[in-house]
Amino acid sequence: MHIKPEEITSIIKNEIKNYEKELETVDSGTIIQIGDGVARVYGLEECMEGELLEFPNQVFGMALNLEQDNVGCVLLGSEEGIKEGDIVKRTGKIVEVPVGEDLIGRVVNSLGQPIDGKGPIKNDGYRAIEVPAPGILERSSVNEPLQTGIKAIDSMIPIGRGQRELIIGDRQTGKTAIAIDTIINQKGKDVICIYVAIGQKQSTVANIVNTLTEEGAMDYSIVVTASASESAPLQYIAPYSGCTMGEYFMNKGKHVLIIYDDLSKHAVAYRTMSLLIRRPPGREAYPGDVFYIHSRLLERAAKLSKENGGGSLTALPIIETLAGDVTAYIPTNVISITDGQIFLETELFNAGQRPAVNPGISVSRVGGNAQIKAMKQVSGTLRLELAQYRELASFAQFGSDLDKDTQARLEKGKRLIEILKQDQYKPMAVEKQIMIIYAAVNNFLLDIKVSDIKRFEKEFLEYMDTHHREIGKAILDKKVLDDELKSALESAIVEFKKIFLM
């Protein structure tokens, strides 16, 4: 085929005319040092604090230290195959996690990726893990109860929706058990539960997931886990990821319960990370902003006003103490951030009182407003009577010649202690709690042997279920014990006692 010279020039002109060069400008830098899950990158001039950076092998990192000539980053993945001299690109985004209804019933890692082998998750988009907490005008006061199903807590240390209540105690005192019982008790109450496991053994998390599945609680729960084998940065972002997933539902007007298990390990992960990127250490080698990492997380728990949908996010952070020392750095920090604490004691646990709640130093600063009036009526004197019993019991060890009044108080105290004991994974409905506590507080159990109290409670509640279901229903409907309801309850107790003591 013969082409004329003028045709060649016109073809070249057309090609030049239609030529489009696609240029992509990417702010990139070079790794100058890498190791222990931490990298120093030179050349990222415009990098922002907390920005997501793209490393080779599809590994992402987070910029934490913005220094004069380099950026200190932590890797959110394996550093395998990444070396000095490799190129790092900016993404212009901060760490985000997927949110949506499909996360319910799933087990995910701190980046929201499924790890339960049930396939991919369809999400409703991505949200940043760090967002400002709701402001004062967006909130309303805590006024709805969040029932834990645990008698000792619902009666003396009530929790409201939107509250932050710390669960604190030594290892092996039943902190996680209280949290799991609370999740199980939300069945049928239209509350979405999120359990965040930070630095836990994978076997422990597997047991918790199995328990929740057996109890039917995974139908409304999400489990976020950053196990002990994962890097410190992934453990550090886990609670923020869980909180973001919860906020999605809260902003839709739903009620959410989130458990951080536990923030002691979270603080240790942050300390590890900070020391590796050479931040100056402070008290107990924690960095200076360790208070802020927990306050900005827990401030995101809120009860939103009606104008903002009326949703709520209730946080139950867990802190592990050493030898019962609540005056250590992290425990005092979190106590000052939260709206109260449930203190669990090793001595009580070993003495067979489970849950091992110490009502003397446990407190709920805002939950009282949310407690239903009927429970307030029956539990009003409970804390005081238990405190008096403990005091008298310690004196009674020294002598046996006690007057009748003291003996009666001691006998009543023993029965109150027995009533507050509860088996694990057996949360109790609030109307049943009210009935049995009413019987104990109003001296109906003094002629029942202490060893028979547990059996009495079980059989009494079964009896009320079969013969006097209307009383429980009336307590739920009225939410207050009026004279008519009191006399009906008292006659039912007397009626059952006759059968029991036969």
From Swiss-Prot:
Claim: Transport is one of the keywords in the record: yes
Keyword Manganese: no
Enzyme class: translocase
Chain positions of site Required for activity: 362
Any single GO CC term annotated in Swiss-Prot or TrEMBL for this entry: proton-transporting ATP synthase complex
GO MF assignments: ADP binding; ATP binding; proton-transporting ATP synthase activity, rotational mechanism
Keywords: ATP synthesis, ATP-binding, Cell membrane, CF(1), Hydrogen ion transport, Ion transport, Membrane, Nucleotide-binding, Translocase, Transport
Binding site for ATP: 169-176
Domain of life: Bacteria
Pfam families membership: ATP-synt_ab, ATP-synt_ab_C, ATP-synt_ab_N
EC number(s) from the headed UniProt entry: 7.1.2.2
Compartment(s) of residence: Cell membrane
Catalytic activity reported: ATP + H2O + 4 H(+)(in) = ADP + phosphate + 5 H(+)(out)
Listed PROSITE patterns: ATPASE_ALPHA_BETA (PS00152)
Membrane association type: Peripheral membrane protein
Similarity comment text for this entry: Belongs to the ATPase alpha/beta chains family.
HAMAP family in the record: ATP_synth_alpha_bact
Subunit organization: F-type ATPases have 2 components, CF(1) - the catalytic core - and CF(0) - the membrane proton channel. CF(1) has five subunits: alpha(3), beta(3), gamma(1), delta(1), epsilon(1). CF(0) has three main subunits: a(1), b(2) and c(9-12). The alpha and beta chains form an alternating ring which encloses part of the gamma chain. CF(1) is attached to CF(0) by a central stalk formed by the gamma and epsilon chains, while a peripheral stalk is formed by the delta and b chains.
Function: Produces ATP from ADP in the presence of a proton gradient across the membrane. The alpha chain is a regulatory subunit.
Name recorded for this polypeptide: ATP synthase subunit alpha
Organism the protein comes from: Clostridium perfringens (strain 13 / Type A)
Gene: atpA
